[in-house]
Amino acid sequence: MQPNITGHNVEITPAMREFVTAKFSKLEQFFDRINQVYIVLKVEKVTQIADANLHVNGGEIHASAEGQDMYAAVDGLIDKLARQLTKHKDKLKQH
């Protein structure tokens, strides 16, 4: 899984790209059939926002998180996506 990372009003540094890629690779332990990942990191005034769209088998998953810095926003985003992926996996098992 290679995430597609874009920035709005923020420059994506190599360190940030590496951090995000490492965090998103951990999501595969929750659901291994993630096809595509689109991540948007943006800054609105003083708020750092991280959005993600995941294309998975059986649908799409979207999450958004805010933080005081971009690293905190990405951590919050990963937590939300992990919960959603676990729920999605359980739904697929029930059918």
Go through the PLM ranges and name each one.
Residues 1-95:
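N-terminal, polar/charged subdomain of small-to-medium soluble alpha/beta proteins
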